[in-house]
Regions:
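C-terminal motif of bacterial Sec signal peptides marking the signal peptidase cleavage site
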Residues: 15-18
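Early extracytoplasmic/lumenal segment of secretory-pathway proteins
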Residues: 21-93, 230
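Hinge/lid segment of periplasmic solute-binding proteins
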Residues: 69-71, 91-136, 155-156, 161-164
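Ligand-binding "clamshell"
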Residues: 94-102, 119-120, 126-128, 219, ...
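Short beta-strand->loop
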Residues: 100-111, 257-273, 282-284
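Ligand-binding pocket segment of bilobal, Venus flytrap-like solute-binding proteins
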Residues: 178-190, 194-266
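Mature extracytoplasmic/periplasmic domains
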Residues: 277, 282-346
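Conserved C-terminal helix/tail region of periplasmic/extracytoplasmic solute-binding proteins
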Residues: 338-369
Length: 369
């Protein structure tokens, strides 16, 4: 089954779950591990290999948005043992006791992690000791080279002006521009473009970014965190805000569909966010020992390699990186060089009032009011 079909299937399963289904659950006496992860984050056959090698059964669920995780975990008794979660959002849940610290003594494969990469990724103090890193990347934009150059032959593509300058974006409206439907991904990039603090939540900064986004709103086809994964490979968009690995995924899906397309990925010179997904164990996990066995399995170099190669997201596993193709290791969209990394920033968690203020900005922009 292709990745495209899996995404559609995962979305359908989530919809069914929202209609009354329960997540994977089980008593602590069962020899299972209940896992909740992003769609397309584990390579085919990996789960089956874990079950075969350990004798531990895996109940594996996927999700499309981080908000889904928050609802399940804050409600309590989710039944999950292992959850892959964005470190920024996970830090909020740690504050209210949702996650427990991992036992590093049970994770000998931590030795495979690259100390230098780990130093660069160590941007959230609040999650230290609570996870093992899984994948990481940047937030930028993917663009169709041919479609953009037809309309803007001389436009520099190292700037977020391609997204936020009305004069430029208006010339791309006919071929399609999409924005993230996420305050944690959209607003920091927009604030950085205005030369403001990307984590600003003060009234003046939010008013400025809202005004700018409303100016380009007529030229934005839609706001979504995943629809562009279907539309970009089919040439139904020419520019899409995206996470770094999705650029490579879009190319792969185009190849699978036999579509000839030239895509590129840019990290804006004004700045872009860095994100990190960690693997967490909920405080009320029913199978904590099995959870550690699963975490250690994911840290194995051969398994980390397969998952990184399949998902097209960067891995912090040094042993696994050595197994990747030279083209992948040298792909600046997946593994940015030091110059590109100097332009990325961390996004900070905010309190409920600040989050509501940011959410109101996005809601007004989406409605065009």
């Amino acid at each position: 089954m292709t990745k495209l079909i899996r995404i559609i299937a995962s979305t359908m399963l989530l919809a069914l779950a929202a209609c009354g289904g329960d997540p994977a659950t089980g008593t602590g006496s069962e020899n299972v591990v209940n896992v909740y992860n992003w769609a397309d984050a584990v390579a085919p056959g990996v789960i089956e290999q874990f079950e075969s090698e350990t004798g531990i059964g895996v109940n594996y669920d996927t999700y499309a948005t981080s908000a889904t995780i928050d609802v399940k975990l804050l409600t309590g008794n989710s039944g999950y043992d292992v959850i892959v979660h964005d470190n920024l959002l996970a830090s909020r849940l740690i504050e209210v006791g949702v996650y427990q610290k991992v036992d590093r003594e049970q994770l000998p494969n931590l030795k495979n992690l690259d100390p230098e990469i780990m130093r660069q990724l160590d941007i959230y103090e609040s999650v230290r000791g609570y996870n093992t890193p899984y994948h990481w990347g940047t937030t930028g934009f993917t663009w169709n080279v041919d479609l953009v150059r037809e309309r803007l032959p001389d436009q520099p593509m190292d700037t977020a002006a391609i997204l936020f300058d009305p004069e430029i974006v208006s010339k791309l409206a006919d071929c399609g521009v999409s924005f993230f439907d996420s305050v944690t991904s959209l607003l920091p990039m927009a604030l950085a473009y205005l030369d403001l603090d990307p984590n600003a939540v003060d009234e003046e900064s939010l008013a400025a970014v809202q005004e700018m986004l409303l100016e380009v709103r007529p030229y934005v086809r839609y706001f979504s965190n995943d629809k562009y994964l279907l539309d970009m490979p089919n040439k139904e968009l020419c520019v899409a805000m995206s996470w770094s690995g999705d650029y490579a995924n879009a190319i792969q899906r185009s190849n699978e569909a036999g579509i000839d397309i030239d895509l590129a990925y840019s990290i804006p010179k004004e700045g872009a966010g860095m994100w990190i997904d960690g693997i967490y164990i909920p405080t009320d996990a029913p199978h904590v020992k099995n959870a550690h066995v699963f975490l250690n399995f994911l840290l194995r170099e051969d398994i980390a390699f397969r998952n990184a190669d399949y998902s097209n997201y960067a891995t912090p596993n040094a042993a696994a990186i050595k197994l990747l193709s030279i083209d992948t290791r040298n792909n600046p969209a997946i593994y940015p060089d030091q110059e590109a990394l100097s332009r990325v920033f961390r996004t900070d968690p905010h309190g409920p009032m600040q989050e509501r203020a940011r959410t109101r900005v996005l809601a007004r922009v989406k409605s065009g009011l």
